[in-house]
Swiss-Prot record:
Name under which the protein is recorded: Peptide methionine sulfoxide reductase MsrB
Species of origin: Listeria welshimeri serovar 6b (strain ATCC 35897 / DSM 20650 / CCUG 15529 / CIP 8149 / NCTC 11857 / SLCC 5334 / V8)
NCBIfam families xref list: peptide-methionine (R)-S-oxide reductase MsrB
Residues the record marks as active site: C118
Keyword Oxidoreductase included in the entry's annotation: yes
The reaction(s) this protein catalyses: L-methionyl-[protein] + [thioredoxin]-disulfide + H2O = L-methionyl-(R)-S-oxide-[protein] + [thioredoxin]-dithiol
UniProt GO molecular function: peptide-methionine (R)-S-oxide reductase activity
InterPro entries: Met_Sox_Rdtase_MsrB, Met_Sox_Rdtase_MsrB_dom, Mss4-like_sf
Family designation: Belongs to the MsrB Met sulfoxide reductase family.
Ranges of residues in domain MsrB: 6-129
Disulfide bonds: none
């Protein structure tokens, strides 16, 4: 992502969006926008707009954050060890904007690969399936066909 475009987008973020994506913050469980979202659509990086997750891979993990079994395209996310807060976890970031998204854990549904991408709502923007064309994400409609 172009640095000047990224800086422009960062200025538009709310405090919680900035804290989560740029300072690796975490929003409160069960008190965020998408933890119980049941609508069909895709989730894009709040900074870059790159598609990251689909509602077709979302499930209720009971943790209080949106949880997914996989990203839409693994090339759009990167992972690295996170040793903060006295734990060893795997952080998930977006490739294009380098936004902190959340963490991935090996306790997801076994029949779907066994991973749980536990993602902060504040790092995401939801595009409902009926708005994909309007928002320029028409290529992702095939996920829902």
């Amino acid at each position: 992502m172009d640095e000047s475009k990224k800086n422009e987008r960062l200025k538009q973020l709310t405090d919680i969006q900035y804290n989560v994506t740029q300072k690796a913050g975490t929003e409160r469980p069960f008190q965020n926008e998408f933890y119980d979202n049941a609508a069909k659509g895709i989730y894009v990086d709040i900074v870059s707009g790159k598609p990251l997750f689909s509602s077709t891979d979302q499930y209720d993990a009971g943790c209080g954050w949106p949880s997914f079994t996989k990203p839409i395209d693994e090339a759009e996310v990167k992972e690295h060890k996170d040793r903060t807060h006295g734990m060893i976890r795997t952080e998930v970031k977006s490739v294009d904007a380098d936004s902190h998204l959340g963490h991935v854990f090996p306790d997801g549904p076994q029949d779907k690969g066994g991973l749980r991408y536990c993602i902060n709502s504040a790092a995401l923007r939801f595009i409902p399936v009926d708005k994909l064309d309007d928002e320029g994400y028409q290529a992702y409609k095939k996920i829902f066909e």
